[in-house]
Regions:
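Active-site-adjacent structural elements that line small-molecule/cofactor binding pockets in enzymes
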Residues: 1-325
C-alpha cells in the first residue's frame, strides 16, 4: 500500500498578475509532491476557454492567450526550488521533434537533480498545431507520432546508436550524450482507445484531465490501460493513475462537470471517491491564492488515505543521484 501523492497544477499564463514560478515556490513550501503546467505555446481563445482560462486577459478579449513555453517555465521553477517534482502536463509531440524531447528532458532531469516526470501527449488542438507551422496530421498520425516519439526518446536515453523507422518520425545514427543519470518516468495524457492502449504498454503514468475524462468514463478507461499492460507482459498496476482536477475551496460553491468545489470536507469526500475508481494521485488545480489553504485543509486528509499503487514519485535518494555535475 502507498500513500496518495498530491501535486498542484500551476498556470502557464503570462498575463499581468500571474506568477507561476512564485506559485511553485509556494507549493514546495507547503509540502506538495509535484507541480505541473499545461503545454500550449500557441493558445488561441478557444483553447483558453476549454481549459477554463476564459476569453479575457488584462480585462480585454484576446485572440491568442499569453502563455509561457512550458519547458522554459519548468526549468526556471527547478532552479528556484530544491525538492518538488516537475511535470509538463503534457508536452504536445507535434510541436517538438523526438530528439528535442529526449535532449531537453535529459537536461532538465540532470539540472533538477532527478525531479522531472515527462508528460507527453499526441496533441489535440488542430488550430494550435497549424498556427505553429507544424505539418497537418490526422488523429491517427498524431498517435503514430506519439508512439514514435516515446520509442526514439527511450532508445536515445539508453543506447549509444539509435536507428529507428517509424510511421511519422525516424532517427538515423542518433547518439545523445550524456545519458540520464536515473530513469525518467513518462506519463501520458491519453483519452481515446488507442492512446489508452499505448499508455498500458509503455507508460509509467496516466494523467487525464477532469474536463476531458469524466469520472463515469474512468473505470472503462483504466480497464483498457490494465488490459494493455497485462498483454504487454507488465503488471496490471504498472501505470500510476493521477487525476488532474480543478478545485475551488469555497463552502458556497458547488461542483460541476469540470470542477470539484465546496468545503474542505466536501472536496476530500469527492476526491476519495476518485481513489475508489483507481486513482493513486491527484494534480489539484486551484486558484493560485488557494494553494496554501488546500495544503492545510485538504491535503493532510488525502494523505491519510491508503491506496494500492505501483510506484512512488522520485525519492530523495534519486534526487541526490541526479545532481548536476
Amino acid at each position: 500500500m502507498n500513500s496518495l501523492q498530491v501535486g498542484v497544477g500551476i498556470s502557464d499564463r503570462a498575463a499581468p498578475g500571474d506568477d507561476p514560478v512564485a506559485d511553485a515556490v509556494t507549493a514546495e513550501a507547503f509540502g506538495y509532491d509535484f507541480v505541473s503546467a499545461f503545454d500550449h505555446p500557441v493558445a488561441g481563445a478557444a483553447t483558453a476557454e476549454a481549459l477554463g482560462y476564459g476569453p479575457m486577459a488584462a480585462g480585454r478579449p484576446v485572440r491568442t492567450y499569453p502563455t509561457y513555453e512550458t519547458q522554459t517555465l519548468l526549468t526556471w521553477i527547478a532552479a528556484r526550488t530544491t525538492r518538488i517534482g516537475i511535470v509538463p502536463r503534457v508536452l504536445a509531440v507535434p510541436f517538438r521533434r523526438p530528439v528535442l524531447v529526449a535532449k531537453t528532458a535529459e537536461s532538465l532531469q540532470r539540472l533538477s537533480r532527478g525531479r522531472l516526470i515527462l508528460g507527453l501527449g499526441a496533441g489535440y488542438r488542430d488550430d494550435e498545431i497549424r498556427a505553429a507551422g507544424a505539418p497537418a496530421q490526422s488523429a491517427r498520425a498524431r498517435q503514430d507520432g506519439l508512439e514514435d516519439a516515446i520509442a526514439i526518446t527511450r532508445a536515445a536515453w539508453a543506447r549509444s546508436v539509435v536507428r529507428y523507422r517509424g510511421a511519422v518520425y525516424s532517427a538515423d545514427d542518433l547518439d545523445l550524450e550524456p545519458k540520464p543519470v536515473a530513469p525518467i518516468p513518462i506519463w501520458l495524457g491519453a483519452q481515446g482507445p488507442r492512446g489508452l492502449a499505448l499508455t498500458g504498454r509503455v507508460a509509467d503514468g496516466w494523467i487525464p484531465f477532469l474536463r476531458f475524462a469524466r469520472p463515469d468514463r474512468i473505470p472503462a478507461m483504466l480497464e483498457q490501460i490494465r488490459a494493455a499492460s497485462v498483454a504487454a507482459g507488465r503488471p496490471a498496476d504498472a501505470v500510476r493513475a493521477v487525476y488532474s482536477v480543478p478545485v475551488r475551496l469555497d463552502p458556497r460553491a458547488r461542483s460541476t462537470a469540470g470542477l470539484i468545489a465546496g468545503s474542505a470536507a466536501d472536496i476530500v469526500e469527492q476526491l476519495q471517491g476518485f481513489t475508489e475508481l483507481g486513482f493513486t494521485g491527484f494534480d489539484l488545480m486551484p486558484r493560485r491564492e488557494q494553494i496554501p489553504a488546500l495544503a492545510e485543509d485538504v491535503v493532510p486528509a488525502l494523505r491519510e488515505l491508503r491506496i494500492p499503487g505501483p510506484r512512488e514519485l522520485p525519492t530523495p535518494a534519486l534526487l541526490a543521484a541526479g545532481a548536476a555535475s
